[in-house]
């Protein structure tokens, strides 16, 4: 007799190397808790509907719980010849409780079984990711709250542009993560759907109660179409997209961390606990954690592209191609959860070199726009003011100094309306104070922004 659940139809059994190629047990045992949870709900419903006896249901449930316990105690070895987590558990269950174990699969297919597992798994992981995003956001808010008055150069094209608050800069990533969090939250509506009871594709002739298993598994709703229930992998693609986009945001932040920690910038100092060294250069302190996060974006985005390509030509309903939905998702989930934890620890322990930042904005031309705006207050058209300031900046570059070093007489040669108050006007801290438009980098505006962020975190 074949040990295959489908062996009755076949005269020749696959060789071991074919079993190994076909099997998914090496990775889908990740779903053991979800598989057992779904099976317990199914067995409970079968008994309540009179499809199996209460005694058989209780035996099945106790057997499943014992398998789950022993698995987590490393007391069970699964077999590739049994293909997947579902058949390995069923085989072990029958071995433990006898014929009652063979009744568990009544009114169910592996098609709706694996879909149920994946919905339960994805729902739990998305909830965990949301919590990790919020935790990182909280650290960002704490750092920003302590650096409202810390001034740094803002950049465009990686060229110094205008002085901004360090708090304002770092809060940009709070809002990126807020949108990521919202996307994950919204996706739960499409993840939290029960496919159990769809069977292979067309439903079942048994008098099952899908509403009962929906309640037992704490799903928010159930699929209205059995074919859709076993064919749908949209929620996996959506989750991979949301993971990839969040990783892109972490990568952008990581790039800034890497730049800020260079000897050329010296804006921050990373903790030794989140840095590594060189095997040949004794002086090196490398931002490897940030670099790894930056590098892992290709990994998660690759999983997204792979899943899109897997589904693009599949006819309804289930196809073995869908076995490829798991490894990419499992790895992407592992990657983003690890990246969020690392990022939180990395920025929580970094030192912000406030004096260096404040001094940097006095050694560049990031206050040039302020000089143009100053001329506008003297009723000079902005485009004319822009031309005047451009010439002053060029002279400064040629002479090796900055706008605060220009003598008043020189300023007045360019335009007679420039007075001695120009030096106070060009001070970086005053540049920030004048920026009071909603969402700007001025201190009062940043504090208002922080209040909104704290309110969001408290919800």
From Swiss-Prot:
Keywords: Amino-acid biosynthesis, Arginine biosynthesis, Cytoplasm, Lyase
UniProt source species: Staphylococcus aureus (strain NCTC 8325 / PS 47)
Protein name in UniProt: Argininosuccinate lyase
Family membership noted in the UniProt record: Belongs to the lyase 1 family. Argininosuccinate lyase subfamily.
Gene Ontology CC terms: cytosol
Domain of life, per lineage: Bacteria
Record GO biological process: arginine biosynthetic process via ornithine; L-arginine biosynthetic process
Reactions catalysed, as given in the entry: 2-(N(omega)-L-arginino)succinate = fumarate + L-arginine
Pathway: Amino-acid biosynthesis; L-arginine biosynthesis; L-arginine from L-ornithine and carbamoyl phosphate: step 3/3
Family annotation (InterPro entries): Arg_succ_lyase_C, Argininosuccinate_lyase, Fumarase/histidase_N, Fumarate_lyase_CS, Fumarate_lyase_fam, Fumarate_lyase_N, L-Aspartase-like
Pfam families: ASL_C2, Lyase_1
GO terms assigned for molecular function: argininosuccinate lyase activity
Record localization: Cytoplasm
